[in-house]
Every structure is written in C-alpha cells, then in structure tokens.
C-alpha cells in the first residue's frame, strides 16, 4: 500500500482541503497521513468562519515525530494544498526534503492554492510568493487553475494558445508534470469544463460538461489533485491517471449538481470515484 503525506487545510463542516481529498484517496487504496495547515469550522467562501492556522513549527514537529518512530521512509509522496501562512511554505518544502532523505523515490505534488477565477484571493499574505519562489522549484507535479497558471508562469494567459505557452514555461521551472485543473475562460468552449495535462512529451486536453450551480462548490481542486496523485501511485500511466481523475471528478460534480446542495457530495458519489461512469478521453494537442 502506498502512503501520502497530505499537508493542507481541514474543515469540520463541509468539504475542502484534506476533507475533500483524504477519503477519495483512501477509496483508491492509498493510505493518507493527513497533516492540517488550518482547522476551520467551514471553508472560507462562506464569508465567515472560526478556527486556527496551525503554528508553522507544528509541521516540522509532526514530521519529526513520524521519523522518530521509524515510519517516514514509508512515505511515497507529499501533497500540499491550502497553506495558512507564508512561513508554512518553507516548512512544507523542508518536510519534503526530510521525506526525500528517508525515501529517495518519494515525489511531491504541489497544489498551488492562490485563488479562483470567480472567487478572487483566498490565501494569506506571502503564500503566493512562497509558492512561486520556493515550492514550485521542488515540486515534481504542480496543479494550477487559471489564476495560478498566470502567476506561476508570469504570463497574461488570455486565450487557449497562451495557456499552452504558460504550461511550457512552468515545465522549465522545476515541475516535470503540470495538470491545469480548470482552463476556465481561456478554454475552447464556454459551455465545457476543460483541463490540460503536460510533460516534456506533450500536452493533452480533456473536456467534460460544465455544471451550473447557484454557488460554485469548493474543494474541487483538492479532490482533483488528490485523485491524480493516488492514481499515479497506484501505477496508472500519466494519461490513465488524468482521465480517471477527470471522469471521477465529473461524476462527483454531476451528483452534487443534482443534489441541489452547496457542498461537494463526495460520500454520495463514492462508487463513481472508484469506478467512474463517465468516459471522457484526453486528446494530445501538442
């Protein structure tokens, strides 16, 4: 069994961060070591919440604790998502280096949570800069949305062709694999949800239905990053992992849309996370 150290947010109510990613990864047969960067009552898009940002020292202390019982070498991957403070970025990069020193085959997926095309800035001061200047260079895989694609590449990205160029730029900055979680307004079709996956071997595009919500669910990117990493650790090829992830997330979104509720319906859609009913295919475009 593969093991993922998942360092991201936790909400008591609803689905975001580790709450959105842990159960789906476990469904795929991966053990998840969840380390929370924040503990909030609910996600921040409600406009109000209670809770705390974990002290930056706690990340290193917890990693040390796992190491001291001799288990850190069993960690196959580090996944980072929503980060509560700029100082935590450094701690997460250090945590990955510690894991890598115990297991040289361990990989790092950075979900560079900075913002959302329709939700604006959602992270603390300094986090964006830390992700760009520190985390990206150490990540094997990075999973930006459109806002994050622009920030990481330093390009404007106003159309499909510019998105392709931005992905190519990011591949020169450290990551070996780039999964663009949502092309949003720079996609080819306004009524579709479009994604990219890129390596040095090429760029693949996948398109699936775009569901309409009164309020967009939160945690979709967290779910996407977690499923992609779990699929890779389970031995799927890059494209198999990309397709399974896109199809499983599509099914979760469809179940959520049909339910008429705000929060992701991960439990209700659990069978489709394991075996998606959707069969959308990735097409190589470069």
UniProtKB/Swiss-Prot annotation:
Known cofactor(s): Mg(2+)
Binding site for substrate: 9, 44-45, 222
Positions contributing to ATP binding: 111, 148, 181
Pathway linked to the protein: Cofactor metabolism; pyridoxal 5'-phosphate salvage; pyridoxal 5'-phosphate from pyridoxal: step 1/1
The protein's name: Pyridoxal kinase PdxY
Similarity remark: Belongs to the pyridoxine kinase family. PdxY subfamily.
Function: Pyridoxal kinase involved in the salvage pathway of pyridoxal 5'-phosphate (PLP). Catalyzes the phosphorylation of pyridoxal to PLP.
Protein's organism: Actinobacillus pleuropneumoniae serotype 5b (strain L20)
EC number(s) recorded for this UniProt protein: 2.7.1.35
Subunit structure: Homodimer.
Domain of life: Bacteria
Catalytic activity: pyridoxal + ATP = pyridoxal 5'-phosphate + ADP + H(+)
């Amino acid at each position: 069994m593969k093991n993922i150290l998942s360092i991201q947010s936790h909400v008591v109510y609803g689905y975001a961060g580790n709450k959105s990613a842990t159960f789906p990864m476990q469904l795929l047969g991966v053990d998840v070591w969840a380390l929370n960067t924040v503990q909030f009552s609910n996600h921040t898009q409600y406009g109000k919440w209670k809770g705390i940002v974990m002290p930056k020292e706690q990340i290193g202390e917890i990693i040390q604790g796992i190491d001291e019982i001799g288990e850190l070498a069993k960690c196959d991957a580090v996944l980072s998502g929503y980060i509560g403070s700029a100082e935590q970025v450094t701690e997460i990069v250090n945590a990955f280096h510690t894991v890598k020193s115990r297991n040289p085959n361990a990989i790092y997926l950075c979900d560079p949570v900075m913002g959302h095309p329709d939700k604006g800035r959602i992270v603390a001061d300094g986090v964006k800069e830390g992700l760009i200047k520190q985390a990206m260079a150490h990540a094997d895989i990075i999973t930006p949305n459109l806002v994050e694609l622009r920030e990481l590449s330093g390009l404007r990205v106003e159309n499909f062709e510019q998105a392709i160029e931005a992905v190519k730029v990011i591949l020169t900055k450290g990551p070996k694999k780039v999964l663009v979680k949502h092309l949003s307004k720079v996609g080819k079709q306004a009524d579709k949800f479009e994604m990219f996956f890129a390596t040095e071997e090429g760029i693949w595009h996948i398109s699936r239905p775009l569901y309409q919500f009164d309020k967009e669910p939160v945690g979709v990117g967290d779910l996407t990053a977690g499923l992609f990493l779990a699929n890779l650790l389970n031995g799927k090829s890059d494209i198999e992992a990309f397709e399974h992830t896109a199809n499983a997330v599509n099914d979760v979104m469809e179940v959520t849309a049909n339910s008429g509720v705000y929060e992701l319906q991960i439990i209700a859609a659990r069978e489709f996370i394991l075996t998606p009913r959707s069969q959308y295919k990735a097409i190589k475009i470069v």
